Amino acid sequence: MSIQNPRTNFIEVFFRMIFGNMQILLLGCPVFKANGCSLPNNTERFFIMAEYFNPGESRSLFNFTTSLQNLLEKKNYHSRDIILVCIGSDRATGDCLGPIVGHKLARFCNTHKNSLHLFGTLEQPIHAKNLEATLQFIHSCYKNALIIAIDASLGVVEHVGYITLGEGSLCPGVGVDKNLPEVGDIFITGIVNLSGFGSQMLLQTTHLNLVMQLADFISLGLFRCLMHSQFRSSLKCAE
């Protein structure tokens, strides 16, 4: 469970006038590190952009897929294994977004095992107890892998029900005060509830319908983008 920090609102209002639907996450200050992403390894970068998508808007899925494809191109995905790490537990409604996304994509990933690998499903979730071991396994087996991290997050009231996408790592568990390894080169989160006190209780009282809507959006967007990516990779191999 990642967190979208409500204290970034005054920053967001200013930068949205410039960047539209892009939220700027300033880095280097602990206040902002809790906002669903971690400090990048390259300390010369001063901010991360996280784009917000409202599943209820007609072009959101197209825009999400396009933005994700652009990030994959930027990360030179053609020559790398793509790893999906769907984080969360099936024991709390608000934290099961990742495993549900993994469950929905499992069959597709199984048919593209040569370059696409999935960790985290309802049957085999990736959570606080096995995340570190899973990451060690990934880094030992897949050299120069491109990791896409998917997790639920908490946020301000106007962002509940939104999807975020950006370049950088997630800090899983920050929303519920857990210290876990950073994950991902690209992050995707679904904002399932409000951030604040009593986060553990919020996970138990989150509406499953909202989680399913977010999971449907993320899994369909990933499916369309990765299908397109696999097709383009096949063309490059044919050349």
What are the roles of these predicted feature ranges?
Residues 2-10:
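Extreme N-terminal basic, low-complexity initiation segments
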Residues 5, 21-24:
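Polybasic, lysine-rich low-complexity intrinsically disordered segments
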Residues 10, 14-15, 19, 32, ...:
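Aromatic (phenylalanine/tyrosine) cluster motif
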Residues 18, 28, 41-147, 152-239:
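N-terminal catalytic or cofactor-binding beta/alpha core of small enzyme domains
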